[in-house]
Swiss-Prot record:
It catalyses: 3-amino-2-oxopropyl phosphate + 1-deoxy-D-xylulose 5-phosphate = pyridoxine 5'-phosphate + phosphate + 2 H2O + H(+). The active site is at H43, E70, H191. One of its GO terms (molecular function) is pyridoxine 5'-phosphate synthase activity. The gene is pdxJ. This is Pyridoxine 5'-phosphate synthase. It comes from Geobacter sulfurreducens (strain ATCC 51573 / DSM 12127 / PCA). The keyword Coiled coil does not apply.
Length: 239
């Protein structure tokens, strides 16, 4: 049975739009856990556009399930992670001009630097995942640099508007799951998943945890966060 990690970045996005103190992502995390989330995910970006350092430190004190920190593999972020000690760090690519993470890491570029960052985090007792496209070369490279997990980027699947394209992406995801499992990697997935499409990916099997944020926060505007999380839990766990 797959788990659900709720990404609460966009609670902070709303807060930062007015430069105030609400809505509070720490309170959102508590509600999400109460509603059945298996973990909380936040992305501390280098430009601090939504989640702030203070949020991360408070979440480490309050999250009762699992805290997953998405971050770039920079010296600054590795240092913060080693100080805060999230349960997992998911290393992601990051560009200042992007609205959201647009694709997976190219693990093959700068493998030694990435391996060094992974080693430092693991030496600090932190499980490390790499956010990658469903590509065999990226899966193999993730294993070579010593990652514990991969998180498969499902954005291309989610954006597919034709049945043939969707099926092709599902096949790529399934192949990445099988290869990652064969190589001893844990498998997570996320990006662009919503209440309409998540079951198609969950039905493939082999995915330990889905990290979903935008669609849950969007639904929460109309239904409340508790209901939005419970609805997604049902889809992920009982696909």
């Amino acid at each position: 049975m797959a788990k659900l990690g709720v990404n609460i970045d966009h609670v902070a996005t709303i807060r930062q739009a007015r430069g105030g103190v609400e809505p509070d992502p720490v309170a959102a995390a508590a509600i999400a856990e109460f509603a059945g989330a298996d973990g909380i995910t936040v992305h501390l970006r280098e430009d601090r556009r939504h989640i702030q350092d203070r949020d991360l430190r408070l979440l480490r004190q309050t999250v009762k399930t699992k805290l997953n920190l998405e971050m770039a593999a920079t010296d600054e972020m590795v240092g913060i992670a080693l100080s805060v000690k999230p349960d997992m760090c998911t290393l992601v690519p990051e560009r200042r001009q992007e609205l959201t993470t647009e694709g997976g890491l190219d693990v093959r570029v700068g493998m030694q630097a990435l391996a060094d960052a992974i080693g430092r985090l693991q030496d600090g007792g932190i499980v490390v995942s790499l956010f990658i496209d469903p590509d065999a070369d990226q899966v193999k490279a993730s294993s070579k640099v010593g990652a514990d997990y991969i998180e498969i980027h499902t954005g291309t699947f989610a954006e597919a508007r034709e049945w043939k394209k969707e099926q092709a992406e599902l096949e790529r995801i399934e192949n990445a799951i099988k290869l990652g499992t064969k190589l001893g990697l844990g498998i997570n997935a996320g990006h662009g998943l919503n209440y309409t499409n998540v079951r198609k990916v969950a039905a493939l099997g082999g995915i330990e945890e889905f990290n979903i944020g935008h669609s849950i926060i969007s639904r929460a505007v109309f239904t409340g966060l508790d209901r939005a999380v419970r609805d997604m839990v049902d889809l992920v766990k009982y696909a």
